[in-house]
């Protein structure tokens, strides 16, 4: 039994040894096949870890709920009714967006602006490391203390439509971890502006926006102006051209308290093309037509009383235009607008031209009555030579030329006795006609009578022509010609007078 048990134990040991060797070999090959996969998975996990590390380096990982905790932390330490301790410096930046218009009659300017205010409040600081790396946050303005900075010369303030919508939700201020607060908002302000109307419509205006604190003096709040002006969002105005935007820091006393103030001065120049085209040019055309109508000679016989009506009509037109301008500009008792002065000048010129027409009509009427001016006035108007010249022809009698004289006398019975003298040297009549030639002489006399009747008819025609010439001379005598020269002279004089001012105005435009 002892040997048998020993053999059984030996056989069992051998079988178990073989089984263990087989399982070890299989596990070895299994492990050798899985090893590359495990190594690859390990390498992949390392690369993914590096990528996550890089992402975390570029974008800080915020802890959820940090913004809420930060807001609660800041509001718990801050009192909206308590200003920061010590002297507070406020940097004020104003960006001009658009000039909505200038009301000359009310002396106001309306502008659209963007406002940025910067100040530091130590009670609104935090450590970004304690709040998930947050370096800035936003809190509504009605939850923190804000300096009471207003526009001192403001007449009216209008809120924008989208600004009203935002105010119903919240008006946030940007707060940085070091306590710097940035408050931005758009606004439409109507400010008072002293309008100088002396050179209207060629005027330049300067309007200021005065920024200051209402309750705090400069021992508590000092304003600092941002000098770099950005006109990136500026939209040009069709009537006003922006010349310059100047910023200055000033001080003034308000109710016994010295206050720090920032003044934004806007320099503008009016674009006068609209007024030149709609008012100045029509006024010039009316004056020029009136002057030409007053002095142009369309007739030399009729009177010209109707031209006074034309002059009065032009004067009334100038008065209406001046009223149109006076309704737009302020009613000042110190200065007269340039455009109104131009209309008054035209009224005076047309009035003087109408009175001058009366003088010309008086001179013309003297000519129609047949009066003649003196040689002095004729020479003054270049109607006669200035220097006298003698054009008389000299005649000399030729003693050798015979002269015949026919003496005609009328007898009672109608007979005509004709005597012929041959020379003036006292030669007597040689002989009396023979009776034999009497019949021939009578025939000759009959022909002479017919000839005389023809001459008489021709003389009557000459008299009629002389009468017509006399009438013509009466209508174009010296005074009439002088009146013509006066018409031409005054027409060019007054046309030049009304043309030069409008040419200067258009040149300055």
From Swiss-Prot:
Keywords: Disulfide bond, Ion channel, Ion transport, Membrane, Receptor, Signal, Transmembrane, Transmembrane helix, Transport. GO terms for biological process: chemical synaptic transmission; defecation; lipid transport involved in lipid storage; monoatomic ion transmembrane transport; positive regulation of intestinal lipid absorption; positive regulation of striated muscle contraction; regulation of membrane potential. Gene3D superfamilies: Neurotransmitter-gated ion-channel ligand-binding domain (2.70.170.10), Neurotransmitter-gated ion-channel transmembrane domain (1.20.58.390). Disulfide bonds join 193-207. Changing residue 309 to I: In ox38; defective in posterior body wall contraction (pBoc). The chain crosses the membrane at residues 276-296, 310-330, 336-356, 488-508. It is found in: Membrane. Changing residue 189 to Q: In ox9; defective in posterior body wall contraction (pBoc). One of its GO terms (molecular function) is transmembrane signaling receptor activity. Residues 1-21 form the signal peptide. Forms a proton-gated ion channel with pbo-6 that is activated by acidification of the posterior coelomic space, leading to posterior body wall muscle contraction (pBoc) during the defecation cycle. Probably by regulating the defecation motor program, required for fatty acid uptake by intestinal cells. Does not bind neurotransmitters such as acetylcholine, gamma-aminobutyric acid, glycine, serotonin, glutamate or choline. The functional channel is a heterooligomer of pbo-5 and pbo-6. May self-associate to form homooligomers with negligible ion channel activity. This is Proton-gated ion channel subunit pbo-5. The lineage of its organism: Eukaryota, Metazoa, Ecdysozoa, Nematoda, Chromadorea.
